[in-house]
Amino acid sequence: MDDNEYRHLTLENGLKVMLISNATADRAAASLDVNIGSLQDPVSRPGLAHFLEHMLFLGTKTYPEAGEYQKFIGQHGGSHNAFTAGEHTNYFFEIDPEQLNPALDRFSRFFHEPLFTEEYVQREKEAVNSEYRSKYKDDFRRSQYAMKAVMNPKHPASHFATGSLETLSDTGSEKVRDQLLEFYDKYYSANLMTLAVYGPQTLDELEKWIKPLFTPIKNQGTPLPSYNAPMFAKGQLPLDMKLKPVKDLLRLNLVFPVSEALSKYKQKPTHYLGHLLGHEGEGSLLNWLKNKGWAESLSAGLGNNNREGSLFQISIALTKDGLENVDAITEQAFSYIQLIKEKGVDEWIFDELQQIDALHFRFQEGRSPVSLVQQLTMNMHVYETDDLLIGDYLWKGYDPELIRHYLNALTPNNMLRIVSNQAFETDKHDPWFAAPYSVSTIDQSQVDTWSAAKSTEGINIPQQNPFIPEDVSLQSASTQSIPQRIYQEDGLSIYHQQDMSFKGPQSSVYISLRSPLAQQGPTNQLLLDAWVELLNDKLNPFSYPAQLAGQGFSLYTHMRGIGIRLYGYRDKQDVLLAKIIDEMKAYEPGQDKWDQIRQELKRAYQNSLLKKPYERSMAELTRTMLKPSYSEQDLLAALETVQLEDLLALQKQFWNKLDAVILGHGNISKAQLSSTGKLVESKLLAETEYQAVARKAVTILSSGEQAQAVEAKHKDSAMTLYIQGGGSELTERARMGLLGQMLHAPYYTYMRTERQYGYVVFATPYPILEQADRKSVV
């Protein structure tokens, strides 16, 4: 239930504002969104919008000290950030509510009195360049820029957006500071901005604060710019691209330019198509591809979505066999599109999606204040005022012709196909991230074959969802501050915490199955990983409709065994759990599935070694501090010799000795949780011997400094400094938490802004289990 009060207003300068008041809020937040981003960069200054975002944090007339804003936010338990997208630049912070007004004072001055100090203009170029370099080997970023390389060069979506020393350097009479000022004066106009503020103060008080602070923002009357060109020029498609990634990724992307969809937020035609094409249940495209052994996962929906055009994408993670059959997979995708044309445009599907999202909106769980204000500022540029809160969930006005309009754009003649594989031979590189690729036109005979694709036996439009909750009643309104143990026998402990804080029908149930096998070497660790992945794959067609209806689960490995988490609406959770348990006990994968999961795990372990340097150093830190822990190299070595028979043996052994712990939280009574416990006990623990499983041990460091090198295959480098606390007591952990909060802002300002040592810079508490620690990264 939403306890917030809202007020929408427009200031004298045209700035649209949403105020949110919640008397019980223990955090305050604000966001300002400019409906301008990197798509508005001057052709001669790629990255200027992003560079401007950086510069606004480096001093204003009233607060000229660089880092003063960051320091103030950090001193009062807050956080801040910003991002630049194609058509948005969004600034946001959260803070202790008592400091909201002075924080707004500092924040507001970004937008009417920034300094753009010459010294920091030069320094911040280095920070932008470091950000660019940090993503140089990021495969997602590389795939984006390979696609940009074949887009219409007249559309700004084809341009470089991050910025670098090269693009931001002064050239002759063109000074980047002058262009910053020109861009700021033109586009940072109140009529292109939206503001949202959240706090425990009354709406009248919030309005009284924001009017004098944000009214000084000038309204230049700047119109939203037009692009005057499509993302792909007429006759440019179809194209076939081969892309060589850094990591061992096998992927097929089918990309279709479609007309803009932002204004169609009520009818949601692209969401409708994404729901059908991205479905994972029985009879779905993904289910068919998995049964062939060709795909691991699939998603569908809008990618690049701007106010004059969009890209609809079908993205498929392939197996090795799938890579050998990309033409057949492509044909099957068009076969499914044909099936949608024949049977899939139906009002009952629209009504079901409407019903599900209405439930999600009605019972949405508490969002963080900063997430709420960010979303509202972006919605305010697109949605009608009455729809600002519900627009993301709104389905209104079933329009089959509108759905068919977008469906008719999903054709072989209107497609960019991208296949990713490390083994490809390529002959081109994109100019900014050096992504190796080659591109060719698609033969007309192949286009004709795909265009004639017919619907295939075994593939169907999804059936009606049986998991839509019927009982959304609430338990009594009592709330327990801490979990209470309601059952204790050797082998099973049950803890219950009824929490009605959010007044919703959702609950979470955590089931920890602790086995001594989990800590008996890397072979057992990878076998548990494999078992869980195979189970998730097996359960997916059954559980996917439940997930859509708001009843999800996750099955995962942890330090002492396997965990099951059920979350969402309480209704029908035990139906889902019973299916999970039955499959855990009965499922024995065949050789084909085993071979496939070995390939997946091998790629996953190898790709972990290619993560960014700071990610690698943090992972190595955790592995070093927790014993027993196994490196990717350990797991890869074990993977070379392990066989299907080893997995089947481990599955049987797993049930011999267990210690199970259950925690129920939220809208769940003791009686309901006890029923869940009996289900677990009868199906999983009836023939199991109890054995307690110890926690992993935290390494206690000796005094002095210890250095450890970590190999990283990347242009950048990283340093992680870890300082171990004096113990695990709550007071020591609180001290480390406070120290991290105090150090974050000055550390960031000195290491990044002043000294330019790196882009990813932070100091933070880093508890390992209950051990109090602090960590800094650069």
What are the roles of these predicted feature ranges?
Residues E207-P223, T676-Q691:
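Glycine-centered hinge/linker elements that transmit conformational signals in sensory
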Residues I20, A25-S38, G47-A49, E65-F110, ...:
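M16 family metallopeptidases and their MPP-like homologs
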Residues M1-A29:
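Mature N-terminal segment immediately following signal peptide/propeptide cleavage
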Residues K16, N129, Q179-L181, Q236-L239, ...:
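Short alpha-helical segments and helix-capping/turn motifs at coil-helix boundaries
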